[in-house]
Regions:
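Conserved nucleotide-binding/hydrolysis micro-motifs of P-loop NTPases
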Residues: 27-29, 102-103, 146-147, 156-157, ...
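Short helix/loop capping segments that flank catalytic or ligand/cofactor-binding pockets
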Residues: 31-32, 105-107, 148-151, 159-161
Length: 181
């Protein structure tokens, strides 16, 4: 769900009388997403208060609020399969961008602080890190007794990568020269 360059450019250039940007940390574990939905409900309330304080049209406020409430709660019975599927597949954070006639979400691999901003354009600065920095790294762990290649992603434990013909220890990796501890 990380936005593509064209999506990012559309967000960057979008303007409206009232654009709502919401960021919230989320959990990958399905049992904990109920807490995330509660946070979204609170952020929705804050967004509505900011929209009303900014003098937004009542219909625009209702449109934005309806989309946010539906995302947090699902349909009237609370069992919309698409919403349940959405919450079952989260990343580290969720970015939501809403304005009259527009609503989009992006699941992000980096952890962001909960916030709401209402302006004449979307607040995308927190989103930029997700599209700017790589979220994986390779580590060559070299010791006297072992050599390992590890892949580290944005979440979860490092994973050892098996490489054929990788030296077995520091002595082999140094070209059979003396290795001091």
């Amino acid at each position: 769900d990380i936005p593509t360059r064209p999506e990012l450019e559309r967000l960057l250039t979008a303007t409206a009388d009232h654009c709502v940007s919401i960021y919230l940390p989320t959990h990958r574990v399905t049992q904990e997403t109920h807490q995330d939905r509660l946070v979204l409900r609170d952020l929705t309330r804050q967004a509505v208060e900011q929209l009303e304080a900014a003098g937004a049209d009542a219909d625009a406020v209702a449109d934005i609020e309806a989309n946010l409430v539906h995302l947090a709660e699902g349909d009237d019975e609370g069992d919309d399969p698409a919403v349940e599927e959405f919450w079952a597949n989260q990343a580290e954070s969720l970015a939501i961008f809403a304005s009259p006639g527009r609503f989009e979400t992006h699941r992000l691999p980096n952890h962001l602080t909960a916030m709401v901003e209402v302006s004449d354009r979307f607040h995308i600065t927190p989103l930029l890190r997700a599209v700017t920095f790589p979220h994986a790294a390779w580590i060559l762990a070299l010791s006297q007794g072992a050599v390992r290649l590890l892949e580290v992603g944005p979440s979860g434990a490092p994973v050892e990568v098996r490489v054929e013909d990788l030296p077995k220890d520091a002595w082999q990796s140094s070209g059979n020269k003396v290795v001091r501890a």
